[in-house]
Amino acid sequence: MNQTNEQRPFDYIAEAHLTASPHFYGDCVPLAHFGEVLQQAIDALNALDRIKKALFYGRDLGITNVSGEVFQNCNSLPEWISKHPDEDDKARNIIHAIIGKATEAGELLEALQATAIEGKPFDVANAGEEVGDGFWYDALLARACGLTFDGIQRTNIAKLRHRFPNAFTEYDANNRDLFGERRILEEGKKVSS
């Protein structure tokens, strides 16, 4: 029995693949420049990881003062997200999730660097671990924002289908309808399951 689109279960990975670029323009980027920028990103995200570990795990950051500036700490960060004290846990989880997701991306960049620059085999087991850790941070953020993975995935695919009605095209990637995409995000418009 052939299933129609309405009967098929929603498969985010398959749906995402439909809107992925099939092209790779490696000749447009010098390898040395790629390696340099990759290292800068890794260094910045490692510094952010040290901040995350200080903020959420109590580790010593090793910074006692900031020269030339009045020292102000990060205690007020949750208040900048929400002015309601009863929502401080949510605000802290939002901060933790965003910083944590970025630091997991840094670990994936290290895996890419090891392969692309150092010539080591790509470590699939490590990549899976980092994706899983990224999911953990995504779950923390989703819960704090009252969202679900299913809802996020369906809305994301609806946005991408708006951008690429049939499949990925370079024209559509470079000429986006940002207002239409934002409307989909705000409405939580979902693809049919």
What is each PLM-predicted segment?
Residues 1-131, 135-193:
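Flexible "arm" and connector segments at domain edges
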